[in-house]
Amino acid sequence: WQSPKVRAEIYDILRFWLDKGVDGFRLDSIPYIAKDTSFPEIDLRKYPDVFPYYSLGPHLHDYLHEMNREVFSRYDCTTVGEGSKTAPEEGWKFIAPERQELDMLYHFGAADIRNETEADDPATGIPYSLLALKRMYAEWDAAVGDGWPTIYLGNHDQPRMVSRFGSDAPEWRDLSAKMLTMFLLTMRGTPYWLAGDELGMTNIRFTRIEEYDDIDTRNHYRKLLREGGDTEQFLREQQEIGRDNARTPYQWDGTLYAGFSTAKPWLRVNPNHTEVNAARELCDPDSVLNFFRRAVTLRKGHPDLVYGSFRLVDADNPQVFAYLREGTGRNYLTVLNFSPKAARFDPKTDLTEAMPLLHNYPAPPIAEKEGPIELRPYEGILYRLA
């Protein structure tokens, strides 16, 4: 990237595809393209986190601004950068409109919290800190300012959304998948989906290393074998966090290979494809897929739900993620129980005149003029406020 000739060639490649009509680009691992070629010495015992030494290097933002000036600004296109490990105070630099670099940046904040935090209260049944998750999204929203955020809970490098942030137990799978759908489609920012999450596809949970295709999983397993590590524990962990959980064939229907192929695919099809598949869900008005479609239609029809501001409500509630979306025409309140247990939520306002627009149970809870409302496990409600 330091070479002007290399950058010019990259810009020619971008123009080639834009001239063919592509709508935009995802820029993978974009914080890492600039390096400090003075190669400073570091003491890994003192600085175990080497991220600052290979990320956000000199002239990174000069390169991105130049790319925008030479290519992106000349086309009707969109750009999104992958920014793993990028903090909010650095993330805004990529997408602030006045800086003219990228349109969007997605971070790994939710994945990191799911992996690295413990339950706020074990009694809630949430295995990570929902309070930390709420703080993280509030911090990013504040840092982005007039820029445009992204929102996602799963991708090709993450386990399935419903298995990770909801529950794939049969009694909760559909409810929690719908609740998470409401979350993604009522937050500020552009929502991103991994194909299959709109069906409620779940982790496959392989039991043998031979079933895995992911090179990271295989390499780590070999390393444990060499060093005498606990390979059984590792395989149990991979059932929850392994990347191949999200890479199984898309479940089009209930046939042998889920309608994905007539030949045996590279990864085993999830056995639940006979229940969780597009053909079946298209015919079921109460399916996760049709709930997703209703939520998308609702979002598109309510501009203030897209562009309105974001503000946490009942921020210290360890079970409920609730927030206001305040716009120029209408205000909305989203209330989401992230727990497999009943929860109480205090809206601090009269909801008796509010209109429930979207709900994942047959009927929403009764709202009183004051006091908390009772939420069922994984219940989600979107209110349009009076």
Predicted regions and their residues:
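Active-site and adjacent substrate-binding regions of carbohydrate-active enzymes
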Residues: W1-A386
